[in-house]
């Protein structure tokens, strides 16, 4: 099997412990600026006046809409964060959702939210590595990777593991950031740490990955135009809540966040796209 060059981590790519450290450090930032959901918002045409929390829920609802699953069946959420999308999925479809994250702090927060919302019968969040899934083959009826797969050292391994635990014909729905123009090493040094990105691939790269891992791509939706306002909302939040951020972060780190974010916006606008991909396990 040929491994795609875009799936080979760079020598200094983040490890699992680095991803956990990132969320330990940035968790308070996202909580303050983004709220309870650790993912972007989606403002489709005609709904540009939504608040950030409303846009985040709209994106989650789109993921739910694109994921066929029946009541009582089992879904896997790879990189589930603090668990709110998993809870919303379980509530909407009355299915069991099993979420994994490499951040112990997110596990604790997710489990507390599950208890508070009385969803413990349907939603189960634990620590786990998406490249070494602790589940039997052919167990799940659907899977997600919602703004998480770019953290992982190998998309190929993640897709191989997802294919192993999914039943034939089951859907795998993911969101990812893909390159449309190659980032320079200097741009990577700015953009990758901002989101703890391990590697980026391309739209064609996904077709190649699916061909190698037993999936067929059914749909690729470019959501970039509706996602970009997340960056503007984040920049505004940093400005409006600077005092609260200054109480959390030392001056050096806060200064780095303020300096980096405008550069991240420029790179995002020209070099990458945000996509939602619907794939299905062959067979």
Swiss-Prot record:
SUPFAM superfamilies to which the protein is assigned, alphabetical: S-adenosyl-L-methionine-dependent methyltransferases (SSF53335)
Record GO biological process: methylation
Annotated disulfide bonds: none
InterPro entries linked to this entry: Erg6_SMT_methyltransf, SAM-dependent_MTases_sf
Group of enzyme by EC: transferase
Catalytic reaction equation(s): (+)-kolavelool + S-adenosyl-L-methionine = (+)-O-methylkolavelool + S-adenosyl-L-homocysteine + H(+)
EC number: 2.1.1.347
One annotated GO molecular function: methyltransferase activity
Keywords noted in UniProt: Methyltransferase, S-adenosyl-L-methionine, Transferase
Entry keyword Signal: no
Binding positions (S-adenosyl-L-methionine): 106, 129-130, 151
Role this protein plays: Involved in the biosynthesis of the diterpene (+)-O-methylkolavelool. Catalyzes the transfer of a methyl group from S-adenosyl-L-methionine to the hydroxy group of (+)-kolavelool, forming (+)-O-methylkolavelool.
PANTHER family: GERANYL DIPHOSPHATE 2-C-METHYLTRANSFERASE (PTHR44068:SF11), ZGC:194242 (PTHR44068)
Family, per entry: Belongs to the methyltransferase superfamily.
Descriptive protein name: (+)-O-methylkolavelool synthase
